[in-house]
Amino acid sequence: MKLLDSAYDHCEEGNYAQALKCYDEILQNDPNNIKALVDKATTLQNLGKLKTSIKFYEKALKLDPKNIDALTNKGSALHTLELYPDAIRCYDEALKIDKKCAMAFAYKGLSLGEQGKEKEALKFFKKALSLEKDYDIAQISKNIAKDLLKSI
């Protein structure tokens, strides 16, 4: 567990290359370490290596199909690649597992909004806020969606 803690500390300090070395060492010894797979994927995503990060999320999901972090983060990477329907499928899968996942609701709202479905997106932002009232992404996005709907 020390290497995972060390990798986390490196990420917090913005030293992603060193964090990736830690994850590689963990995965060399334990290729099925779900935490290391998801955290490595997240680190790669933070570095803008989206397609590679998605591959690591998929490895983690093969081992643990109900991993909420892997599902929502994979959805986020797909969203960044503008693959909104694929992203929404990830969020829907996460919501089947955890009906109170504010992040999945908010992120689904973002993907819907990018598809021009502001009215539907607004419902998801409101749901995210009903679960987590101080959720910044949902609040900001809700306000933007409302403004867009007023301008139509």
Briefly describe each language-model feature range.
Residues E12-E13, N46-L47, T80, E114, ...:
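Register position in tetratricopeptide repeats
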